[in-house]
Swiss-Prot record:
Protein name, as recorded: Adenine phosphoribosyltransferase
Localization: Cytoplasm
Signal peptide positions on this chain: none
Species of the source: Neorhizobium galegae
Pathway listed: Purine metabolism; AMP biosynthesis via salvage pathway; AMP from adenine: step 1/1
HAMAP family: Aden_phosphoribosyltr (MF_00004)
Length: 181
């Protein structure tokens, strides 16, 4: 990815200071999603490394991972798997607790969302501490997925999420980095 592509994507992301609490800068991709050219560029760049690899499924984390993951799945002719908050899926599920900044939460996936050995890419808008993404990787592996990679539009490298995923042996790809929180 070229420096100009990174600049275009970073510029399309709105930064909101002191949200959701003082000292946090919220990186809002809704501006990127609303800009047709930037959205197309982001999806094209997310997909590019995986073309021709025979990826079976894209797993998207609620909620912005659904938007990006659905677009990726379409372009890669792959299926899409939603990873949802507990209690939101209608069929039998497998769940996994994961760490939040203050406490824990649970995510779920349908028991039959992935066949054993299927190649899956995890997708979301942002990787920060990695708690949600690590939980999602463990959940996917629990039902037999081969997690090929995880991709995100934004990396907040100071928070260590990329390193947490890499410690699990998961390749991580991102499009833009922002320092701080």
């Amino acid at each position: 990815m070229t420096a100009s592509t990174k600049d275009i994507l970073a510029t399309a992301i709105r930064s909101i200071p002191d949200y959701p609490k003082p000292g946090i800068i919220f990186r809002d991709i809704t501006t990127l999603l609303g800009d047709a050219a930037a959205f197309r560029l982001a999806v094209d760049e997310l997909v590019k490394p995986y073309e021709g690899l025979g990826v079976d499924k894209i797993a998207g984390m609620e909620a912005r991972g659904f938007i990006l993951g659905g677009a990726m799945a379409h372009q890669l002719s792959a299926g899409f798997v939603p990873i949802r908050k507990k209690g939101k899926l209608p069929y039998r599920t497998v769940s996994m607790a994961y760490a939040l900044e203050y406490g824990t939460d649970e995510m779920e996936i349908h028991v039959d969302a992935v066949k054993p050995g299927e190649k899956v890419i995890l997708c979301d808008d942002l990787i920060a501490t990695g708690g949600t993404a690590v939980g999602a990787v463990k959940l996917l592996r629990q039902i037999g997925a081969e997690v090929v990679s995880a991709c995100f539009v934004i990396d907040l490298p100071d928070l260590g999420g990329r390193k947490a995923l890499e410690a699990l042996g998961v390749e991580v790809r991102t499009l833009a980095e922002f320092s701080g929180h």
